[in-house]
Every structure is written in C-alpha cells, then in structure tokens.
C-alpha cells in the first residue's frame, strides 16, 4: 500500500512513530513522510553495504517506502514483542501477497499484525542500530554480514537497550536524588536569629508600646482635668436633682474653713460644685433613718422627695408656699455645719433651692388667650358639613352591603358562575399587567 492510500489518522500515527510533527494538514504530512523515508533509505544504502546485499529484491525507493509504511501501520509495541522468533528476512512484495489473500476473509487486524511481525526489522532496525552503536560503542565487527545477523541486531535494539535507559544515561539530571537534609537544616538554622537577640527585640517592642500607652494616659488625664476645672467655675444649672447623691467632698467648704465668707453672699454658691449623679427618680429608696431622725416616725414607702436633714429645716406646712428663711440665715447654717467637727455620717449638699421641690411648685394654669393667639397646627375644614343623620344611614347601608353572600343567604348557597369567574380573571390579568409595567418603569407598586 502506498502512503497516498492511508487515512489521515494512520498517517498521523506513522509520523509520531517516526518522530515527525503529526499536527499538520494531510498534504503537508504526506509530503513530510515521503521526504523522511526517502532520506532514510538513501542513508541506509550509503552506510550499510550488507543491508543492500541482503535485499537484492527490494524495489525502487518509492515502492520500498510505500511497503515500509504498510509494515509500520499497526501498533509498534506488539511488533517488538513478537520479534523474539528468529525469522529470515524475505522481500515484502514477493511473499506478502499470498498471505494477505489468504487472511482477508478472517480479520483485517490479524493482517496488520502479521505484516508488523514479518518486517519491522529491515528498514528501521538498521537505522536504530547505527545510532545506538554510535552512542554505546558496541564492538560487533561481523554484524554487518548476513541476513540472520540483521535479525539478531533488530532483536538487540528492541530488548537489550531500551530507549528509556538511553535517555536516562544521556540526562543524569533527571535522576531523582535525595537531598542532604542535614545541610538544609543547618542553612535554615543559620538564617534564624538567636534566642537572646529575639528576647531583646521583644523587650524593646514592649517598652515602646508601654511608653505610648503611658503618653496616651497622661494626655487623657490632662484633657479630663481641664473640663472639670471649667465645670467648677460654671454657674449651677437650673435643673438641680431632687435627691441627695453619693457623698462628695467638695472644695467650697474647705475654703470656708480658711476664710469665713461674709453673711450677705447668696446661698446658691453652696451648690456650685454639685453635679447631679442621679438623673432618674425611679427605684430610689427614700428612707434615711440614720441620717434624718426627725422622719423616724414616718414609715410609708411612698416615693417622696428626699427628706431634708435637720440642718436644713423647712417651714411647718410644706403643702403651700410659705415664708422661707432668708438667704443669709441659710448661709449661716451652712457655715456652722462646715465648722463643727462632723460626727454625722451624712451631710446633705444637694438641692438648696427650695423653690424647685414638688410641694412648693405651682402647676401652670391654662391660659386661654395665649392659646388662641397661637397659629393653628392643622388646616380647618371649609364649606358645608354633611348632615349627621344622613351620614349614619349611609354607614348602615354600607355595613349591610359588606356582609358576605354566604352569610346573607346561608340556606341557598350561591354558586360562582362562569361569567363571574371570567370577570375576576380579567381583573387579575389587568392588575398583573399594571404591576409588570410599573416594575419595568421602576415604579414601586404599593
């Protein structure tokens, strides 16, 4: 068979076996294969005189190339395995035709394998032998004479020196070598820093962090102190707490000990340093039995304002607004408290302004004129109003209409007709269409 009669897949396989590029167009592949085989044949004829003597009956170059292709048509490996039988090489054109005619009836695969077994040796075996001899340097002087020796040579190329071993010999870098782990570990240890240096570095880092934290703390303390000083100078807010907070030692009484204030100064300055800690009056126990002995007889648990200590007495009737002691007297009493060596555990420094207690505060009365003078917050209705009776009748009618049909006539149940269903269906479709359009236009449908 010629190369022209082979299929594209077979040509590709042949090219791969020979060692050519197989991924080409059919015409170019054919051309390349023909060139390759012709060159191979020429080199064989030039190099091996014994091969030319053995093959007297070989046809011209093109025919031989064609027959050679048919030899390499099957799987190459199977052919190599079956080469163990020493068979004398016979010309392919003479003896192949009767065998092929006999076996065509059975199976075509057997034909290809038989062809492979008969003649993979003559053309390629010599080429392989030449190359391998150059590499390995085999010394066989009488291997070039005789057809039987060529068969032995072919056997040797296949079995004795496999291709993989040759490649391995050529490329020693491909061999898997186990690394010297000791050297590797030593190199790694050299790269690593010592424990002492590591500890020093860590300590330095920690010191830097601590210093930064200390700086931040000092800054925050300074910033906190500044607003405190400002708050002390400020006038007390009008909204003073009703209840006594936790005991706070203020700076004002200490000053008083050193220098007595004149009597004319107001009592409001006593509350200058007071900052209310209690903002809600819920859940506060109001009994100060130890501190306030005058309220001992009162056992009620009603949440009332904090009972004042005996040092700050009020008038006899707390219900109504009464004549409160003058500011000077209050000031005097406060100064006496500070002067006495305090045996009392609790001193009330809270709400000195008695006007703010709930007993004394007067509720605001409604001012009609002021409310009428203010503008309206709503829009008033203009025009005639509907009569009251008609509106009531309408509501009754609506109510009767809203009663569902199955409640109205439960004895004779109304079956839903086809027309009603159609109407309902059309309405549903309309609604769906509207929703779709709204969604498409980016409108949010409620």
Curated annotation (Swiss-Prot):
Pfam families linked to this entry = NUSAP
A molecular function (GO) held by this record is: DNA binding
Keywords per UniProt:
Cell cycle, Cell division, Coiled coil, Cytoplasm, Cytoskeleton, DNA-binding, Microtubule, Mitosis, Nucleus
InterPro entries cross-referenced by the UniProt entry: NuSAP
Q: Where in the cell is it found?
A: Cytoplasm; Nucleus; Cytoplasm, Cytoskeleton, Spindle
Q: What residue ranges carry the coiled-coil annotation?
A: 197-223
* Compositional bias ranges of the Basic and acidic residues kind: 93-104, 126-137, 416-437
Q: Which GO terms describe its biological process?
A: establishment of mitotic spindle localization; mitotic chromosome condensation; mitotic cytokinesis; neural crest cell migration
- Residue spans of biased composition, Basic residues class: 153-173
Going by the entry's taxonomy, the superkingdom of the source organism is recorded as: Eukaryota
Disordered: region residues: 39-179, 224-250, 399-446
Residue ranges annotated as compositionally biased, kind Polar residues, are: 399-415
Q: State the family named in the UniProt similarity comment for this chain.
A: Belongs to the NUSAP family.
Q: How does it assemble?
A: Interacts with DNA and microtubules.
* Name of this chain's protein: Nucleolar and spindle-associated protein 1
Q: Which organism is it from?
A: Danio rerio (Zebrafish)
């Amino acid at each position: 068979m010629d190369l022209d009669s082979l299929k594209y897949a077979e040509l590709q396989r042949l090219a791969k076996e020979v060692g050519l590029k197989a991924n080409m167009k059919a015409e170019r592949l054919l051309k390349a294969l023909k060139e390759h085989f012709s060159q191979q044949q020429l080199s064989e004829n030039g190099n091996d005189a014994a091969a030319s003597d053995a093959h007297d009956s070989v046809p011209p170059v093109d025919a031989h190339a064609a027959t050679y292709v048919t030899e390499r048509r099957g799987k190459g490996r199977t052919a190599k395995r079956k080469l163990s039988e020493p068979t004398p090489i016979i010309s392919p054109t003479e003896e192949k035709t009767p065998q092929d005619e006999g076996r065509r009836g059975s199976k075509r695969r057997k034909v290809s394998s038989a062809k492979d077994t008969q003649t993979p040796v003559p053309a390629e075996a010599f080429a392989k032998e030449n190359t391998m001899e150059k590499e390995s340097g085999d010394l066989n002087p009488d291997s070039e004479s005789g057809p039987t020796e060529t068969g032995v040579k072919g056997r040797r190329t296949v079995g004795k020196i496999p291709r993989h071993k040759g490649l391995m010999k050529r490329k020693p870098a491909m061999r898997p070598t186990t690394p010297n782990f000791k050297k590797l570990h030593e190199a790694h240890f050299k790269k690593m820093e010592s424990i002492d240096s590591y500890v020093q570095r860590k300590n330095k880092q920690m010191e830097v962090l601590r210093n930064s934290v200390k700086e931040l703390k000092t800054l925050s303390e300074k910033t906190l102190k500044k607003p405190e000083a400002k708050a002390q100078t400020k006038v007390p807010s009008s909204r003073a707490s009703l209840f006594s907070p936790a005991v706070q030692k203020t700076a004002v009484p200490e000053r008083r000990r050193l220098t007595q204030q004149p009597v004319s100064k107001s009592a409001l300055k006593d509350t200058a340093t007071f900052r209310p800690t209690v903002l809600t009056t819920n859940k506060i126990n109001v009994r100060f039995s130890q501190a306030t002995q005058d309220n001992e007889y009162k056992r009620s648990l009603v949440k009332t304002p904090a009972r004042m200590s005996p040092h700050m007495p009020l008038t006899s009737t707390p219900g109504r607004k009464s004549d409160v002691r003058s500011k000077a007297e209050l000031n005097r009493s406060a100064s006496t408290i500070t002067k006495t060596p305090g045996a009392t555990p609790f001193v009330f420094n809270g709400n000195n302004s008695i006007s703010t207690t709930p007993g004394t505060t007067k509720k605001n009365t409604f001012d009609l004129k002021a409310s009428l003078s203010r503008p309206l917050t709503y829009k008033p209705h203009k025009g005639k109003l509907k009569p009251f009776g008609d509106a009531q009748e309408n509501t009754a009618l609506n109510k009767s209409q809203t009663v569902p049909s199955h409640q109205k006539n439960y004895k004779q149940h109304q079956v839903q007709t086809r027309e009603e269903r159609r109407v309902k269906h059309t309405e549903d479709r309309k609604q769906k269409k509207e929703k779709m359009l709204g969604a498409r236009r980016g409108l949010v449908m409620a």
